[in-house]
Regions:
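Extended, low-polarity transmembrane helix blocks
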Residues: 1-112, 119-178
Length: 178
């Protein structure tokens, strides 16, 4: 037996392929989930009292510091970051209703497909949907000439395609057919 197709003796299972798929599936799932969650994050500035480093107590003068903290809330949601959205709004090849729908659905779709992938619920379907989302994001970035982002998304599309090829090694899933 060669190392490329190393099977457990007599089981017919390619554990290397299974482990490769699990690692890639895990990475793509975590990437999608956290990217979707980040769509609900924003920075808020709060004031905190200045702490005297020598005593560890609040400064007696009452001096305050502005500190940025990250908070997550439904009201913070922005599927497409404002600077990109401002550029995309003026793009004639991107209809406004499509941009609005994509902006509203991107975060929840990333979280949903990421969770599906992580749990093994419709693994192939969730990978395919993620691939379509990355293609749609690529179209937008091409239109506003964000070539670095296009290259990064190309890598994501390649990873999704590779995961779809490895899906035959998906041994740990709740719904294997999809």
């Amino acid at each position: 037996m060669n190392d490329m197709n190393e099977n457990e003796e007599g089981t017919g299972r390619d554990w290397g392929g299974t482990m490769a798929f699990l690692v890639l599936r895990g990475w793509l799932a975590v990437r999608a989930i956290l990217t979707g969650i980040e769509k609900f994050g924003a920075y808020k500035t709060i004031q905190k009292p200045l702490i005297d480093p020598a005593t560890g107590m609040e400064d007696p003068s009452g001096a305050m510091l502005d500190v940025k903290v990250k908070v997550y809330a439904l009201t913070n949601y922005a599927g497409i970051p404002a600077p990109l959205r401002d550029k995309l709004v003026n793009e004639p090849l991107l209809p406004h209703p499509v941009l609005t729908a994509f902006d509203h659905l991107l975060g929840p779709a990333l979280i949903l497909t990421g969770m599906m992938l992580l749990l093994g619920l419709g693994t192939r379907a969730s990978l395919f949907l993620q691939g379509l989302m990355y293609i749609a994001l690529t179209v937008g970035l091409i239109l506003i000439r964000q070539d670095d982002g296009v290259a990064w998304l190309g890598i994501h599309v390649a990873l999704v395609a590779f995961a779809l090829m490895l899906a035959k090694h998906n041994k740990f899933a709740l719904l294997k057919k999809w």
